[in-house]
């Protein structure tokens, strides 16, 4: 791979990492842009240390989406049970629903922190010119 091509792909990866960080300020609406960018240029980096960054970002995206959806579904299910318990005057259901909603929110929070950690770790490795594991 030529130096110009490697430099271009390095800048491209900096942009995608940046877009992932910016997506936190757009309620995740920009998440789709860097993942499309990663899939578009992924094969251009085959056989280089830069390919690890494309794979790292793609895996980070998909695992984050799956766990975020799981957390949201658990929370929504629990809050629905909480609403039913208010109508039925059942304290046990209310306590269980509150605990389950807390568990769902814990999953969402952990996913948020894990995603941010992976973006920061990957971006630091890219800046240092190293592959990510």
What are these regions (language model features)?
Residues 60-75:
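Hydrophobic alpha-helical transmembrane segments in multi-pass membrane proteins
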Residues 3-6, 71-109:
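Membrane-helix interface segments in multi-pass membrane proteins
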Residues 1-26, 30-62, 117-133:
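Membrane-interface extramembranous regions at the lipid-water interface
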Residues 11-14, 18, 29, 59, ...:
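Alpha-helical transmembrane segments of integral membrane proteins
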Residues 31-37, 65, 78, 82-85:
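Hydrophobic alpha-helical segments
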């Amino acid at each position: 791979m030529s130096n110009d091509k490697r430099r271009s792909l390095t800048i491209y990866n900096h942009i995608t990492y940046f877009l992932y960080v910016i997506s936190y300020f757009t309620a995740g609406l920009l998440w789709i842009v860097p993942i499309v960018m990663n899939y578009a240029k992924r094969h251009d980096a085959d056989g280089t240390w830069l390919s690890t960054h494309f794979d790292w970002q793609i895996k980070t995206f998909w695992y984050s989406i799956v766990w975020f959806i799981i957390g949201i579904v658990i929370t929504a299910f629990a809050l629905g049970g909480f609403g039913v318990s208010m109508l039925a005057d059942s304290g046990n259901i209310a306590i269980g629903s509150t605990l389950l909603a807390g568990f769902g929110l814990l999953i969402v929070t952990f996913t948020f922190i894990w995603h941010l950690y992976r973006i920061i770790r990957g971006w630091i490795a890219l800046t240092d010119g190293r592959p990510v594991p």
